[in-house]
Amino acid sequence: MARMQESADLLKCSFCGKSQKQVKKLIAGGAVYICDECIELCNEIIEEELGQAQGQEEEHGELPKPSEISAFLDKYVVGQDQAKRILSVAVYNHYKRLRAHEQIGGRRRRDEEDTELIKSNILLLGPTGSGKTYLAQTLAKLLDVPFAIADATSLTEAGYVGEDVENILLKLLQAADFDVERAQRGIIYIDEVDKISRKSENPSITRDVSGEGVQQALLKILEGTVAAIPPQGGRKHPNQDFIQLDTTNILFIVAGAFSGLEKIIGERRGKKGLGFGVEVASKKDEEKEDIFKDVRPEDLVKFGLIPEFIGRLPVVATVANLDQESLVKVLTEPRNSLVKQYKRLFEMDDTLLTFTDDALEAIADLALERKTGARGLRAILEEILVPIMYDIPDRDDVTEVVITGEVARGEAEPELITHTAEEKTA
């Protein structure tokens, strides 16, 4: 009887049920008791959860301000100040929206004052070789998010020969090493979107599988949908498991040269003259990018984009054509400029590479003649330097290679400065 009374009087932990004899310490709080072991376990759980939250915060890092984003772009991209400002603000607002969404645990608050922040994708207008792709790549580098590039001309509507729209998302998943959460915060750059304009302004009766059909297929992923992604590509492996990817928080940057759009804008602005062969623009030398700055949705519709597609791209930025001066800056000024890269390659062979000012201007002129912009600069440098890069590893006597304007234009051979020449000069 005494033993039963002792058992009844024995205090127990309200959480694990252990008696006060089985634990080191039992703390009372009203009619509830907690032992030292449960306290230690609670502390471990709290520390783990706080550590995960802190790790997530460190992973995302502090969101750079628009001015900081623009300053970072300045280190790698020459000119395009207006485009940099627009992109910086758009990217800042996009990831600020993501942070706000994460702070409420991915759920919309039921507060009447809460405002849902809608995603703003970006449309980039500008000529080939003006730095559109590089701007997007540099943004992804700064933000440390997965980045994928897709060519709109390779896409077709589902069921036809070509790439499905879902293949774009597969590229982003691959860039994120199939980390779905990371991919869902990434950036997708779709180039040559002007090439998927529909054939006429009016809706087509016949199927336009590589034009309007692709625009229709892109609508859902641009706005936000949960897409089923085949990890090995869809059409060749129909029985594979699918990965669910939510595109709601993916930033899409859609770009194109939109050749001919300036005429449509010019006509709307009342610059269409009367008579045969009249120039569309009032000034013959008016820059295309200046006209592009006045682009309106109705101009893009007339060009061949469907209204629903334009509506998913509320932010419009234009990039300028690069002149000779800008191309010379592209060659020399960015942190990882082409000239710096080739100089480093020559340094590895203990050789100094020097470009004269007229050489840089000649290289820029060649890019302008070929109408390749900054994109064609590397190919021109390769043409000039490959023969000498072939010989230099076998020439221990060469200390410096000088590239002049004549060399760049193919009128002369590079000047080689050797140990012997230096000794004679000394």
From Swiss-Prot:
SMART domains xref list: AAA, ClpB_D2-small, zf-C4_ClpX
Domain of life from the UniProt record: Bacteria
PROSITE patterns registered for this protein in UniProt: CLPX_ZB (PS51902)
GO cellular component terms listed in the entry, alphabetical order: HslUV protease complex
UniProt keyword Kinase present: no
Annotated keywords: ATP-binding, Chaperone, Metal-binding, Nucleotide-binding, Zinc
Domain ClpX-type ZB, chain residue ranges per copy: 1-54
GO molecular function: ATP binding; ATP hydrolysis activity; ATP-dependent protein folding chaperone; protein dimerization activity; unfolded protein binding; zinc ion binding
Binding site for Zn(2+): C13, C16, C35, C38
Gene Ontology biological process: cell division; proteolysis involved in protein catabolic process
UniProt keyword annotation of Metal-binding present: yes
Residue positions binding ATP: P127, T128, G129, S130, G131, K132, T133, Y134
HAMAP family: ClpX
General function of this protein: ATP-dependent specificity component of the Clp protease. It directs the protease to specific substrates. Can perform chaperone functions in the absence of ClpP.
Protein family membership: Belongs to the ClpX chaperone family.
PANTHER family named in the record: ATP-DEPENDENT CLP PROTEASE ATP-BINDING SUBUNIT CLPX-LIKE, MITOCHONDRIAL (PTHR48102:SF7), ATP-DEPENDENT CLP PROTEASE ATP-BINDING SUBUNIT CLPX-LIKE, MITOCHONDRIAL-RELATED (PTHR48102)
Known partners and oligomeric status: Component of the ClpX-ClpP complex. Forms a hexameric ring that, in the presence of ATP, binds to fourteen ClpP subunits assembled into a disk-like structure with a central cavity, resembling the structure of eukaryotic proteasomes.
Protein name as catalogued: ATP-dependent Clp protease ATP-binding subunit ClpX
Species per Swiss-Prot/TrEMBL record: Corynebacterium efficiens (strain DSM 44549 / YS-314 / AJ 12310 / JCM 11189 / NBRC 100395)
